[in-house]
Amino acid sequence: MVIKNAKFVISVADAKSLYNTEASEIAIAGKSNVGKSSFINYICNNGKLARTSGDPGRTRLLNYFEVNNGEFFFVDLPGYGYAKVAKGEKTKWGAMIEGYLTGSSNLKNVFVLLDIRHKPTDDDKMMVNFLFHYNIPFTLIATKADKLSRMQQMKNRQMLASEMGVGVENVYLTSSLNKTGKEAIFDRIAQILG
């Protein structure tokens, strides 16, 4: 599996008007400052594909990215758990995320991004419990691996697996800064697309 090209297609503000990709979709979920945009840009080898920002909570829409001329799509979900957002806005995002996850007939897997430096938040656990409850396949991806020593990476990978109730082999380590973890992610995508 290699990503040759990727492009932004559309933003959707409401789960009632989901974009029909007519292709497999992999959703990207995670808390607001976990590095979802950086992950998409790194995996797709395009630093300008998804807008990155030091301002958490920037993604407020479902953003669709077409990969390899429609072989599959990444769908970037709004980041959850951002404190500086009005309660009404958070409720709207929650409904949009839930509506997409339960309403997209093309969704094949959800990449749940976690910051390897920290224990999963209650919001992270709520997301994974939601996916378990609705029997939606997911993959845990630990971002920002460059921030820790190799030994600390292994220790924290084990901690994330334990906290989230999955085997350690189901936690993938990545660093968009050090450009590591891409091959394992490509292998995972190939598995998902079958």
Predicted features and spans:
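Canonical P-loop GTPase G-domain recognition
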Residues: 3-15, 147-194
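Hydrophobic aliphatic residues
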Residues: 43-47, 101, 164, 189
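Conserved C-terminal guanine-recognition region of P-loop GTPase G domains, centered on the G4
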Residues: 98-169
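Helical mechanochemical/support elements of P-loop NTPase systems and associated helical scaffolds
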Residues: 22, 48, 61, 89, ...
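Conserved nucleotide-binding/hydrolysis micro-motifs of P-loop NTPases
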Residues: 58, 72, 79-81, 117-119, ...
